[in-house]
UniProtKB/Swiss-Prot annotation:
Record keyword Repeat present: no
SUPFAM superfamilies: Bacterial exopeptidase dimerisation domain, Zn-dependent exopeptidases
Source lineage: Bacteria, Pseudomonadati, Pseudomonadota, Gammaproteobacteria, Vibrionales
The organism of origin for this protein: Vibrio vulnificus (strain CMCP6)
Annotated function: Catalyzes the hydrolysis of N-succinyl-L,L-diaminopimelic acid (SDAP), forming succinate and LL-2,6-diaminopimelate (DAP), an intermediate involved in the bacterial biosynthesis of lysine and meso-diaminopimelic acid, an essential component of bacterial cell walls.
The gene coding this protein: dapE
Cofactor notes: Binds 2 Zn(2+) or Co(2+) ions per subunit.
Active-site residues annotated for this sequence: 70, 135
Record-given protein name: Succinyl-diaminopimelate desuccinylase
GO molecular function, one term: acetylornithine deacetylase activity
Gene3D superfamilies xref list: Zn peptidases
Reaction catalyzed: N-succinyl-(2S,6S)-2,6-diaminopimelate + H2O = (2S,6S)-2,6-diaminopimelate + succinate
Involved pathway(s): Amino-acid biosynthesis; L-lysine biosynthesis via DAP pathway; LL-2,6-diaminopimelate from (S)-tetrahydrodipicolinate (succinylase route): step 3/3
InterPro entries: ArgE/DapE_CS, Bact_exopeptidase_dim_dom, DapE_proteobac, Peptidase_M20, Peptidase_M20_dimer, Peptidase_M20A
Length: 377
């Protein structure tokens, strides 16, 4: 039995061992298909990261698919039922690293676009593809660099579907219409190292910091809003001391992260954290890493088109949520356009035995094609 176009392409992409930031030829496969459709291709290589921007048409609106060809490492091979880079069908599922995150989405985007253009060769507006090999890594030379390049020449995406695995139980049951922002602080509180038997000759930075850390951890940053939960403050890492039980540490390192809603901004968070630390008279250094601002698409033609597309395939409308971590959508949203995420079920992403339901690949292709028809036919 011959594989369907989307299944065959998904298998081809999975078989390429594109562990971040490697692309392993995935983009060449996609580019060849897009060139055959009349897309203009612009490869953008920044250091170790491979990206491309493809566009068909010159008119507005500019609708784009966005995604990544890189995958996370497979982990321990002995825990996989099948080789992670040998796509394998079993009981209605396709197994392999990247099946759900997100080579299935990439294949669905390509096939949906091929079908749409075959039926509507003179479609309205323009179609774009923004593809990177640096989403699972440090996200320094990937989508953000492509976005900066496009914005510098005033080529802004009006509407974008990011193919992240948004679904929970069945494909299309959840569409992400926004994401929280993320900011990380690396705090070093300085004291004076000494012997625990002579505390008067030392200055314990852990003791001095606890009240300030407690104050930050119990702060009500905001109340959230209709679309976002309240901002959360979490401490993932702390470190102090030499490992010896008789040495007062000279420094105390605390790393914390805030996931914040549209009720807050980076600048306000920095201001409030600094105020709290200063109130406790600490000698400290604080370095910030800005991981992205929150974004929200609460209304608009894209959201209407996607909701209708999902409903036409599933006979039920998707839930619109902003839960989860960050995605490259945060960079694309800087252009001021509408951004949503729609992709496969995320139950096995980043796990051994990652898989996608084969029928879901067909449904996702139909959803993407229907979205194109709703917007550009």
């Amino acid at each position: 039995m011959t594989d369907s176009p989307v299944l065959a392409l998904t298998k081809d992409l999975i078989s390429r061992q594109s562990v971040t930031p490697e692309d392993a030829g995935c983009q060449d496969v996609m580019i060849a298909r897009l060139e055959a459709l009349g897309f203009t291709i612009e490869r953008m290589v920044f250091e170790d990261t491979t990206n491309f921007w493809a566009r068909r048409g010159t008119q507005a609106p500019l609708f784009a698919f966005a995604g990544h060809t890189d995958v996370v490492p497979a982990g321990k091979l002995e825990h996989w039922h099948t080789p992670p880079f040998e796509p394998t069908e079993k009981e209605g599922y396709l197994y392999g690293r990247g099946a759900a995150d997100m080579k299935g989405s990439l294949a669905a985007m390509i096939v949906a676009t091929e079908r749409f253009i075959a039926e509507h060769p003179d479609h309205q507006g323009s179609i774009g593809f923004l593809i990177t090999s640096d989403e699972e890594g440090p996200f320094i030379n990937g989508t953000v660099r492509v976005v900066e390049t496009l914005m510098a020449r005033d080529e802004n995406i009006d509407m974008c579907i990011v193919g992240e695995p948004s679904s929970t139980e069945v494909v299309g049951d959840v569409v992400k219409n926004g994401r929280r922002g993320s900011i990380t602080g690396d705090l070093t509180v300085k004291g004076t190292q000494g012997h625990v038997a002579y505390p008067h000759l030392a200055d314990n930075p852990v003791h001095k910091s606890l009240l300030a850390i407690h104050a930050l951890a119990t702060t009500e940053w905001d109340k959230g809003n209709e679309y976002f939960p309240p901002t959360s403050f979490q401490i993932p890492n702390v470190q102090a001391g030499t490992g010896a039980s008789n040495v007062i540490p000279g420094e105390f390192h605390v790393q914390f992260n805030l996931r914040f809603s549209t009720e807050l901004c980076n600048e306000r968070i920095v201001e409030r954290v600094t105020q709290t630390l200063d109130q406790h008279d600490l000698n400290y250094d604080l370095k910030w890493t800005y991981n992205g601002d929150p974004f929200l698409t609460d209304t608009g033609a894209l959201l209407d088109a996607v909701v209708d597309a999902v409903d036409s395939v599933n006979q039920t409308k998707p839930a619109l949520l902003t839960t989860g971590g960050t995605s490259d959508g945060r960079f694309i949203a800087r252009m001021g356009g509408q951004v949503v995420e729609l992709g496969p079920v995320n139950a096995t992403i980043h796990k051994v035995n990652e898989c996608v339901k084969i029928d879901d690949l067909e449904k996702l292709t139909d959803m993407y094609q229907k979205t194109l028809e709703n917007l550009l036919a």
